[in-house]
């Protein structure tokens, strides 16, 4: 049975790099949110500075996810799937903007629950250094990233079972570690949770 694994974390934690490496190791389909579809492209424009209501952005993420989930379910028939961001990003990023959790959960009700979530943590100052060369997006401010980091831990520790992955959460701190060190930690933790993930 193929598995659906999600990578989450604040901006600059290294999740895109690690998600790609793990997907390659597991011979999995790599995917990401926002997607590169029409809705995902609109979201990227807004994140780069275009204006819209925060509720509109939340609804766009949810709509993009409808398309994404459809593709994930197709891909799972053939291989494991590894996603760089998923519904958890919507919950913590949009709650950091003051959108009620109930609203976010309702508009994402159809989202498929993954088998495992890998949360990459990092020191906030190191994350900001890693992001220095990138184009800034609306969420890439230290105060917002701090709220988002707290939001992830609040989500993991909540008793709400909505979107609770079958094999739970893996938390890996990437601060002051090489890409290889982090990769090895993640891979070992995944195998520990799902021993038959590598055939």
Curated annotation (Swiss-Prot):
Cysteines paired by S-S bonds: none
Pfam families per UniProt: Thymidylate_kin (PF02223)
Enzyme class: transferase
Keyword Calcium found: no
Gene Ontology molecular functions: ATP binding; dTMP kinase activity
Binding, ATP: 9-16
EC number(s) given by UniProt: 2.7.4.9
Superkingdom to which the source organism belongs: Archaea
Keyword Ion transport in record: no
GO biological process, alphabetically ordered: dTDP biosynthetic process; dTTP biosynthetic process; dUDP biosynthetic process
Record keywords, A-Z: ATP-binding, Kinase, Nucleotide biosynthesis, Nucleotide-binding, Transferase
Catalytic activity, reaction form: dTMP + ATP = dTDP + ADP
GO CC terms in record: cytoplasm
UniProt family annotation: Belongs to the thymidylate kinase family.
NCBIfam families: DTMP_kinase
This protein's name: Probable thymidylate kinase
Gene source species: Methanococcus maripaludis (strain C7 / ATCC BAA-1331)
Species classification: Archaea, Methanobacteriati, Methanobacteriota, Methanomada group, Methanococci
């Amino acid at each position: 049975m193929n598995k659906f694994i999600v990578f989450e974390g604040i901006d600059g934690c290294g999740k895109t790099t690690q998600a790609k490496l793990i997907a390659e190791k597991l011979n999995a389909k790599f995917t990401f949110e926002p997607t590169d579809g029409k809705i995902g492209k609109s979201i990227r424009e807004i994140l780069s500075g275009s204006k819209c209501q925060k509720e509109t952005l939340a609804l766009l993420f949810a709509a993009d996810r409808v398309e994404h989930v459809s593709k994930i379910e197709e891909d799972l028939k053939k291989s494991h799937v590894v996603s760089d961001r998923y519904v958890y990003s919507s919950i913590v990023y949009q709650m950091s903007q003051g959108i009620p959790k109930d609203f976010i959960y309702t508009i994402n009700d159809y989202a498929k629950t993954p088998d495992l979530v890998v949360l990459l943590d990092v020191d906030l100052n190191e994350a900001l250094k890693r992001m220095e060369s990138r184009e800034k997006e609306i969420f890439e401010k230290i105060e917002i990233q701090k709220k988002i980091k707290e939001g992830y831990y609040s989500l993991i520790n909540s008793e709400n079972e909505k979107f609770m992955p079958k094999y739970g959460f893996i938390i890996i701190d990437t601060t002051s570690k090489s890409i290889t060190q982090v990769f090895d930690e993640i891979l070992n933790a995944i195998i520990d949770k799902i021993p038959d993930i590598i055939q």
